């Protein structure tokens, strides 16, 4: 199962790199969001996709699940949500000010005034 998840992470990362290299601001924001999801999926896969009990319930459990990757992923999801919201607001404000979301057209917009 871990091998399949690693391939899925690679596909998500390659799609996100394609989106980040595009000229539209919305696609760039979607690409950065997708790369965070790919890295979260990679971290949770490297933590192990196994079944077990949490170590705080009972003392005589044969298989434990490591809670550290889950805690890290939860923190990363919150940070990714905040940065995505900031990027969306920044892209919207840039579109309202400059009238375009194309990165190539933004280069000379302020120089013409």
From Swiss-Prot:
InterPro entries: CPA3_antiporter_subunitC, Mnh_C1_su, NUOK/Mnh_C1-like. It is found in: Cell membrane. GO terms for cellular component: plasma membrane. Keywords: Antiport, Cell membrane, Hydrogen ion transport, Ion transport, Membrane, Sodium, Sodium transport, Transmembrane, Transmembrane helix, Transport. One of its GO terms (biological process) is sodium ion transport. GO terms for molecular function: antiporter activity; monoatomic cation transmembrane transporter activity. The chain crosses the membrane at residues 1-21, 28-48, 72-92. It is a multi-pass membrane protein. The keyword Membrane applies. May form a heterooligomeric complex that consists of seven subunits: mnhA1, mnhB1, mnhC1, mnhD1, mnhE1, mnhF1 and mnhG1. Belongs to the CPA3 antiporters (TC 2.A.63) subunit C family. PANTHER family: ANTIPORTER SUBUNIT MNHC2-RELATED (PTHR34583:SF2). Mnh complex is a Na(+)/H(+) antiporter involved in Na(+) excretion. This is Na(+)/H(+) antiporter subunit C1. The gene is mnhC1.
């Amino acid at each position: 199962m871990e091998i399949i998840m690693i391939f899925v992470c690679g596909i998500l990362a390659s799609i996100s790199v394609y989106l980040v290299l595009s000229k539209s601001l919305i696609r760039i924001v979607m690409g950065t969001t997708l790369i965070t999801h790919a890295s979260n999926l990679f971290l949770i896969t490297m933590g192990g996709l196994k079944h077990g009990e949490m170590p705080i319930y009972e003392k005589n459990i044969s298989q434990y699940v490591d809670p550290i990757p889950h805690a890290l992923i939860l923190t990363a999801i919150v940070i990714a949500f905040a940065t995505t919201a900031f990027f969306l607001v920044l892209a919207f404000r840039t579109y309202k000010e400059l009238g375009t979301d194309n990165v190539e057209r933004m280069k000379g917009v302020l120089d013409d005034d």
